[in-house]
């Protein structure tokens, strides 16, 4: 019997498996199993589909237990700025602390989400990398008035991103602007020094 947890089409489809419990057997999948442990996995681009999925999980997990932490694992190249801010606002809105952990990479929008985890609960694995830069822009066209509107919106998004990163890293918005004028790539240790994370996790095998 399926547990009803559907993996979005944007995700790589992983095989389901049968799990034995005191109540019998049930069909499940890795994402559903992680969800049961209050773990959300962002392993795709940040877009409207992944944002809606993550926001729904955050809200459901809050409803299930508003006082128990949620963990978000991140391995993402980034993506849409509006989708980023939708996830960000939901992370700040829900009552549970959201712990963030970078596996692989957290680039662009995903780096902001990594930094937005609860203070003291942001981490990365030793070989993870973090990339920050100004919000990407697409080619603009149209009348002069349209271009002015688009330019103003691009500047608004950039200032919002700088303010958000400043709030979570302790860097000034001015320093964030300088650092994100071009791609800034950080190792896990570099992200720790920059204030994007609070710790670099050791491998579990080393602690056994």
Swiss-Prot record:
E.C. numbers: 3.4.21.92
Keywords, comma-separated and alphabetical: Cytoplasm, Hydrolase, Protease, Serine protease
Compartment annotation: Cytoplasm
Encoding gene (name): clpP1
GO MF entries: ATP-dependent peptidase activity; ATPase binding; serine-type endopeptidase activity
Reaction equations catalysed: Hydrolysis of proteins to small peptides in the presence of ATP and magnesium. alpha-casein is the usual test substrate. In the absence of ATP, only oligopeptides shorter than five residues are hydrolyzed (such as succinyl-Leu-Tyr-|-NHMec, and Leu-Tyr-Leu-|-Tyr-Trp, in which cleavage of the -Tyr-|-Leu- and -Tyr-|-Trp bonds also occurs)
Gene Ontology BP terms: protein quality control for misfolded or incompletely synthesized proteins
Disulfide bonds: none
Active-site residues, record numbering mapped to chain: 108 (nucleophile), 133
Primary residence: cytoplasm
Protein name: ATP-dependent Clp protease proteolytic subunit 1
TM ranges: none
The UniProt record lists the keyword Cytoplasm: yes
Source species: Corynebacterium efficiens (strain DSM 44549 / YS-314 / AJ 12310 / JCM 11189 / NBRC 100395)
Function per UniProt: Cleaves peptides in various proteins in a process that requires ATP hydrolysis. Has a chymotrypsin-like activity. Plays a major role in the degradation of misfolded proteins.
Subunit structure: Fourteen ClpP subunits assemble into 2 heptameric rings which stack back to back to give a disk-like structure with a central cavity, resembling the structure of eukaryotic proteasomes.
KW Cytoplasm (keyword) present: yes
GO CC annotation terms, alphabetical: cytoplasm; endopeptidase Clp complex
């Amino acid at each position: 019997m399926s547990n009803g947890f559907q993996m979005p089409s944007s995700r790589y489809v992983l095989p389901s498996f049968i799990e034995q419990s005191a109540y019998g057997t049930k069909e499940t999948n890795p994402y559903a199993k992680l969800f049961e442990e209050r773990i959300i996995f962002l392993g795709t681009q940040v877009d409207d589909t992944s944002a809606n999925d993550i926001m729904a999980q955050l809200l459901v997990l809050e409803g299930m237990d508003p006082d128990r932490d949620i963990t978000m694992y991140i391995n993402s190249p980034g993506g849409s700025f509006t989708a980023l801010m939708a996830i960000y606002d939901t992370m700040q809105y829900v009552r549970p602390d959201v712990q963030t952990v970078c596996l692989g990479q957290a680039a662009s929008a995903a780096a902001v989400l990594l930094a937005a985890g609860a203070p003291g609960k942001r981490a990365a694995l030793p070989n993870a990398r973090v990339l920050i830069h100004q919000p990407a822009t697409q080619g603009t066209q149209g009348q002069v008035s349209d271009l002015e509107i688009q330019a103003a919106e691009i500047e608004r998004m950039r200032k919002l991103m700088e303010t958000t990163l400043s709030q979570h890293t302790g860097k000034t918005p001015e320093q964030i602007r300088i650092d994100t004028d071009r791609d800034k790539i950080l190792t896990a240790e570099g992200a720790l020094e920059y204030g994007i994370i609070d710790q670099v996790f050791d491998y579990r095998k080393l602690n056994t």
